[in-house]
From Swiss-Prot:
Pathway: Amino-acid biosynthesis; L-arginine biosynthesis; N(2)-acetyl-L-ornithine from L-glutamate: step 3/4. Pfam families: Semialdhyde_dh, Semialdhyde_dhC_1. One of its GO terms (biological process) is L-arginine biosynthetic process. Belongs to the NAGSA dehydrogenase family. Type 1 subfamily. Keywords: Amino-acid biosynthesis, Arginine biosynthesis, Cytoplasm, NADP, Oxidoreductase. The active site is at residue 149. It comes from Geobacillus sp. (strain WCH70). InterPro entries: AGPR_AS (IPR023013), AGPR_type-1 (IPR000706), NAD(P)-bd_dom_sf (IPR036291), NAGSA_dehydrogenase (IPR050085), Semialdehyde_DH_NAD-bd (IPR000534). This is N-acetyl-gamma-glutamyl-phosphate reductase. GO terms for cellular component: cytoplasm. It catalyses: N-acetyl-L-glutamate 5-semialdehyde + phosphate + NADP(+) = N-acetyl-L-glutamyl 5-phosphate + NADPH + H(+).
Length: 345
């Protein structure tokens, strides 16, 4: 299969190529960039080695439509909503790693992202690619909207509780921390070494664009879900997200009940691992991999459930989940191209 990556020089695009170059069903990967044209990919990213034909090209949608069966968008907001409709209309499958097609309500998107997006026709056509919970729709998708990094960690952690209606709908708190690569490759003062090193910063307080994305999916599982409290922090590491989730139980629970629920919910999931009683995951334990590791606890004193969910923001939170969705869309083994163990230490 021939595939294209638009935005190949960003962190998400680089990770896509890292996995796709070893994918058994991908024969050629065309690389497109708005910032670099005509140079070999390895000149900018020597770590990938000399990949035959990996020349960065100027974005050409018509050429992609003629040559490729699937196009990945690893681009900032506003790019895929402009270019993807042409590809879709020509029968090309599109997997979008940006937020352009995640929200079904255009007015909600415009309020949180401060820009316009695609028409309702394409928003309604888009399938949300939380692989573990939306596989049936993903199998039929032509336009796949890959979840954001924070929503992936939060939703995988919350899904069993919300779907089984075990927690109070107005009690959800998600306290999330991310490595600096989540901010992208473009230089900024906030991600300057001197600003980030030996420092922890909260940002976008009550205003992060992933809030409506998380709430949209939670309400699809339980229409009574109320607005959540969601906080995001930048921490001095390159990769990784830890989402610590708190919610009030509707009735008294036990740790055994919770663990049984999570193990049953994810027993057929290739990339979600539930920890043993009293064990909680660390970001280092999923580094460079497509795994989401989850630990759970119940506080009898407060009646609250605590869920800890960790992912690599560039893999399960971006490129890895996108390839996992590609595999499901094409009817391939879900693990194809993704079975790399985490890098440790």
């Amino acid at each position: 299969m021939n595939i294209a990556i638009i935005g190949a020089t960003g962190y998400g695009g680089v990770e896509l190529l890292r996995f796709l170059q070893h994918h058994p069903h991908v024969h050629h990967c065309s690389l497109y960039s708005s910032s670099q044209d005509g140079i070999h990919f390895s000149e900018s990213f020597p770590h990938v080695g000399e990949i035959e034909g990996a020349i960065l090209q100027k974005i050409d949608v018509e050429q992609m439509a003629d040559e490729c069966e699937v196009v990945f968008f690893a681009t900032p907001p506003g790019v895929s909503s402009t270019l993807a409709p042409t590809l879709i209309d020509k029968g090309v499958k599109v997997i979008d790693l940006s937020g352009d097609f995640r929200l079904k309500d255009r007015s909600v998107y415009e309020m949180w992202y401060k820009r316009q997006t695609a028409s309702d026709h394409y928003l309604q056509q888009a399938v949300y690619g939380l692989t573990e919970w939306n596989k049936e729709d993903i199998q039929k998708a032509q336009l796949l909207s890959n979840p954001g990094c924070y929503p992936t960690a939060a939703l995988l952690g919350l899904a069993p509780l919300v779907k089984e209606r075990l927690i109070e709908e107005d009690s959800i708190i998600v306290d999330a921390k991310s490595g600096v690569s989540g901010a992208g490759r473009k230089a900024s003062l906030n991600t300057h070494f001197s600003e980030v090193n030996e420092n922890v910063k909260i940002y976008k307080v009550n205003s992060h664009q992933h809030i409506p994305e998380i709430e949209q999916m939670l309400k699809a599982w339980n229409e009574r879900i109320q607005p959540i409290t969601f906080s995001t922090h930048l921490i001095p590491m390159t990769r990784g997200i830890m989402a610590t989730i708190y919610a009030k139980a509707k009735k008294e629970l036990s740790l055994e009940t919770l663990l049984d629920l999570y193990k049953t919910s994810y027993e057929d999931s290739k990339f979600v691992r539930v920890r043993k009683p009293g064990q909680f995951p660390a970001t280092k334990e999923v580094y460079g991999s497509n795994y989401c590791d989850i630990g759970v606890a119940y506080d009898e004193r407060t009646g609250r459930v605590t869920v800890v969910s960790v992912i690599d923001n560039l893999v399960k939170g971006a490129a890895g989940q996108a390839i996992q969705n590609l595999n499901v869309m094409m009817g391939w083994d879900e693990e194809s191209g993704l079975m790399l163990a985490p890098i440790y230490p």
